[in-house]
Structures are given as structure tokens and as C-alpha cells.
């Protein structure tokens, strides 16, 4: 699961630690039940059979038949690298085998400031997530200034800085011990010992369409440098090992393919690079941020790519999706003009999520149905239109969509209703999973993450361009009208909304505009929640 450009969101992720309020004692070693997601920004997903892993703090969703007790649908991994440090999960991969526990890999990142994500190492589990082993990052030592490729010893840039080298994507080979990480500026790296050590994988430079270890080269290995050296094709955002054992790597200069027959006796790989161009059989853009495989029973599995317009290479690059039905022999462009973040597939259906919502195709991308309104189960509400879809995955039981406002689940039996022309016209109903932080918590729930307040706003600080909306949470003893008002620092009214709300904990959203729809300036804002003759107050720090 790739996370290109997610550093901007990383620094804004509000992470809750449900269940840790009473954790004055050491954290347990095993998966522990939790009441909600760790964050409402869900950017990484990894299916594992019926179950689903999600970031940013390794939450596992279990279907009813797999739950330790009926109410325990969500479990949280108790990994100190996440619960006691500033790391979040930036890349996820879960590998399942019949009659064996899932193997789970998590690439970690932390904020290095200035909207930059930094490499934080890895977590690896071989027992279905019950326990995780911590692994160091995949970076170079200062003396790693050469790399052997075939008969050549190539000069290399030692990538020693954690910043801009956060794991973007993970792929695991069929043996379960070999893994590849798409490491942004650190390139493509390989581990053959479950992440205990990593080695650099040599990819073609921007000037070559293919390389082979049978030939000799002299190009420098490394990302672009300020003095002009380095290559965009050595900046890697996505990777995949498909059913045939072919390794794919999406970079800033196209898509790289290495088949099983391309591997030499020393493990060095021949590569072919595919790039963008105006021709129909080329990629829409050179920046490949996601790679997904479509399982088929009647043909070779197609490969789907989220391809973005890049800063180099051929002119006329576009955002969109590119697919190959035959392992790279030919390519086809679809969804041209759409900025797509993630892809998933189940049999004939392909799912893509992007800035404009969820896209579904059942005819290999010839036509698409777009879904940007998500009606919620058991409710008359839909997700706010400002919410962005960020990730997508399929399990054997459901379709999952990660958003900037929670995790959506749709029963597999309801997927057909997503398609235009479906015989059953009612729109499908989604289940929404979100972070659960109580208002007026009990004493044993109170902590730094769960303050004892009557109302709160999150995310706070609120960055409208990044967060899209802020939620003001409060609790009602009985159903009735609620008025939420926002004031500026001089206590001048900026915005107000009145709506009828049911009893219990509720939320009202604000998008950072005034009553005229104009964006408000950076500053401190105060809000009031008025209901049933009572008023509670709070504060929001807004920055543009």
C-alpha cells in the first residue's frame, strides 16, 4: 500500500490510544480489544483473508466468526514502537496461507518536520499479529558508496538520512522471508531474512529502458541530488510481487518489471522500464504511486497502476490509471484525468479511490461508475462531501474504503449495487468505523489522549487545506435541537449551525468558512454548543 505525498497528512494525524487510559502497567504482549480506530484518517489497509489490518497504529478488524467475543470486532496490536514512540504505520502487507497464521509487515514513519516523513523501521509478525518483532530501518551506512551489479562496481549515493525515506509500500515473496520495500529517496531495497538486514536493488537510470547483469554499466545509483546527479527512477513509491513471481516497482520515472527468468545466479535482476507518453499503449504519467493485481481464473492476472503526471520525461503526462492485461506486453490508459491514490480488485471488479471518490469497473476499465456519496447503515446521514477517499482493499467478506473521516465497510453481497445498471436500485449502505473518544469520560477512561471535557474539537490544530473539516463532539442527555456557534478571537460570530440530534454523543462539523462561505484567516477561534438551556465551550486553533 503506497503512501506517496502522505507526509502532508502524517503531521496532521490525530492518534487516539483507546484502551491505554489505564495503562500505567506494562502493555500486554498480545492483541487487545479496542473500542475504535486509532485515527479517522485511514490511509493504509492490508487484507488478511476475512480480516483487515489498518493504520496508523495496527488495528485488526475481525468478522463475527473470528472474534474472541461477540463485541470484540476490533483488536489493537500492542507494539511499543507504536504505543510508546512517535511512529505511525506508513506501509502494510499481510500474507496468508491456508491453515497458518497471517504474516504481517508494517513499515513505520515519523514526522521529521516541514511536512516530511522519515523512516522509522519495521514491525514483522509471523503469528497473525499476536506479537511483533522490531526491525531497524533500511538505510545505508555512510561508507556504502558503491554497489555491485554484474561485472560492474557502480558508484552509489549513500542514503543515510531518515527524512524522505519512509517506507511507501511493501511486497513479500512466496517464501515469506524475502521482502521488498519502496523507500522513496532510498529506492527499492530487499531483505532475505525477514527484515533483519536490507540491500539495495539496482534499477535502470532515467536514460535507459532496460539493464541486465550480463552487461557492464557506469551510472550512479541514487536519487536526484542538488548538484544534478541521480535519477528519478531510483525514487520508488510502490512495489508488488505478482502471481508469476514477477517483481514490479513504481518510481518517479515509470514502471519497472523483473520476471523470474530475469534473476541471475547471484540474485541480481535484469529490469525493463516502461514510461509515459502520448501513445495509447504508454503510461498516463511517470509517477507510479500504486500497483495492484487483479486475481483472475481464466487468464493472467492484470496489473493496475495509479499513474500521476510527473515533472520529467515525456510531455503531455496526465493523472489516471494504467493497466496491463498481459504482464507488460501492452498497456492501456483509463480514468485519465483522475488523481487516484489506491487500487484493489476482486475477480472481475476493479476498485480505485481518489480525489473524486470511489470508482468501480466490471469490464476491465472500459466503463466506470463513480461513487462520491456514501450512505451509512442504520442512519439517514451520508459522509460529508468534503471527505476524501484515501485507500481501498477487499477481503473475502467485504469491500473497505479508508477515508479522511473513518473506515467504510460494505458487505460483499452489496457490491453489485455500486454498478450502474444494477438490477437492485437502492444505494448500498455502508458501515462507518471511526475513532471513539468519549465526552465526559469515566475516571478509568481519562488520560492524556482522553481528557475529561464536556466537548472537544478534532483535529486541533485544524488545517482546512489538509483536514477538510473539524469535528466538534458533545453529548446530549435527550434528543433535541443543538446550536453550534464559532467566534473569532474578538468574540465576533463567524459561523453557526442548528440541527436536531438524537440522544448520546454527537458531532457537528465545520469546514473553516464563515456564514458567507469565505475562508477564515489563521487564528484562535472559540465555539459554543447550546442545547436544552445548557452551554459548553471550547477552542480551535486554525492555521492556513
Predicted regions and their residues:
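Asp-box/BNR beta-propeller loop motif
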Residues: 24-32, 58-81, 119-140, 189-201, ...
Amino acid at each position: 500500500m503506497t503512501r506517496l505525498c502522505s507526509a502532508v497528512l502524517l503531521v496532521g494525524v490525530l492518534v487516539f490510544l483507546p484502551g491505554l487510559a489505564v495503562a500505567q502497567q506494562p502493555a500486554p504482549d498480545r492483541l487487545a480489544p479496542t473500542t475504535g480506530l486509532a485515527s479517522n484518517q485511514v490511509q493504509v489497509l492490508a487484507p488478511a483473508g476475512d480480516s483487515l489490518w489498518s493504520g496508523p497504529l495496527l488495528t485488526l478488524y475481525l468478522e463475527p466468526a473470528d472474534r474472541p467475543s461477540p463485541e470484540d470486532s476490533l483488536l489493537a496490536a500492542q507494539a511499543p514502537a507504536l504505543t510508546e514512540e512517535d511512529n505511525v504505520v506508513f506501509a502494510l502487507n499481510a500474507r496468508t496461507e491456508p491453515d497458518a497464521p497471517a504474516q504481517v509487515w508494517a513499515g513505520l514513519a515519523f514526522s521529521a518536520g516541514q511536512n516530511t516523513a522519515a523512516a522509522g523501521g519495521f514491525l514483522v509478525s509471523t503469528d497473525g499479529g499476536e506479537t511483533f518483532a522490531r526491525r531497524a530501518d533500511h538505510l545505508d551506512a555512510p561508507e556504502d558508496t558503491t554497489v555491485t551489479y554484474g561485472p560492474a562496481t557502480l558508484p552509489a549515493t549513500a542514503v543515510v538520512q531518515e527524512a524522505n525515506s519512509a517506507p511507501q509500500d511493501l511486497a513479500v515473496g512466496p517464501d515469506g522471508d524475502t521482502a521488498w520495500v519502496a523507500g522513496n529517496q532510498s529506492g527499492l531495497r530487499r531483505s532475505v531474512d525477514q527484515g533483519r538486514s536490507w540491500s539495495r536493488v539496482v534499477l535502470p537510470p532515467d536514460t535507459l529502458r532496460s539493464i541486465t547483469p550480463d552487461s557492464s554499466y557506469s551510472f550512479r545509483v541514487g536519487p536526484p541530488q542538488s548538484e544534478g546527479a541521480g535519477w528519478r527512477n531510483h525514487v520508488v513509491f510502490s512495489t508488488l510481487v505478482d502471481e508469476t513471481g514477477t517483481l514490479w516497482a513504481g518510481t518517479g520515472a515509470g514502471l519497472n518489471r523483473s520476471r523470474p527468468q530475469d534473476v541471475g545466479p547471484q540474485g541480481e535482476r535484469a529490469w525493463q522500464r516502461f514510461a509515459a507518453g502520448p501513445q495509447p499503449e504508454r503510461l498516463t504519467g511517470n509517477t507510479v504511486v500504486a500497483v495492484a493485481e487483479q486475481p483472475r481464473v481464466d487468464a493472467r492476472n492484470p496489473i493496475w497502476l495509479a499513474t500521476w503526471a510527473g515533472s520529467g520525461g515525456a510531455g503531455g503526462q496526465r493523472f489516471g490509471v494504467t493497466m496491463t492485461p498481459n504482464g507488460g506486453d501492452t498497456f492501456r490508459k483509463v480514468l485519465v484525468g483522475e488523481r487516484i491514490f489506491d487500487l484493489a480488485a476482486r475477480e472481475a471488479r476493479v476498485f480505485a479511490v481518489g480525489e473524486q471518490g470511489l470508482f468501480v469497473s466490471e469490464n476491465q476499465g472500459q466503463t466506470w461508475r463513480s461513487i462520491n456519496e456514501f450512505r451509512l447503515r442504520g442512519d439517514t446521514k451520508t459522509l460529508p462531501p468534503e471527505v476524501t477517499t484515501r485507500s481501498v482493499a477487499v477481503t473475502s467478506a467485504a469491500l473497505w474504503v479508508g477515508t479522511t473521516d473513518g473506515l467504510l465497510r460494505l458487505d460483499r453481497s452489496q457490491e453489485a449495487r455500486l454498478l450502474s445498471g444494477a438490477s437492485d436500485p437502492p444505494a448500498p449502505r455502508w458501515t462507518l468505523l471511526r475513532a471513539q473518544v468519549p465526552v465526559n469520560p469515566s475516571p478509568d477512561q481519562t488520560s492524556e489522549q482522553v481528557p475529561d471535557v464536556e466537548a472537544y474539537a478534532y483535529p486541533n490544530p485544524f488545517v482546512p487545506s489538509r483536514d477538510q473539516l473539524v469535528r466538534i463532539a458533545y453529548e446530549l442527555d435527550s434528543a433535541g435541537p443543538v446550536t453550534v456557534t464559532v467566534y473569532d478571537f474578538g468574540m465576533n460570530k463567524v459561523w453557526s449551525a442548528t440541527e436536531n440530534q438524537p440522544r448520546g454523543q454527537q458531532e457537528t462539523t465545520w469546514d473553516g468558512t464563515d456564514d458567507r462561505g469565505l475562508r477564515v484567516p489563521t487564528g484562535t477561534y472559540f465555539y459554543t454548543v447550546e442545547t436544552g438551556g445548557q452551554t459548553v465551550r471550547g477552542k480551535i486553533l486554525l492555521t492556513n
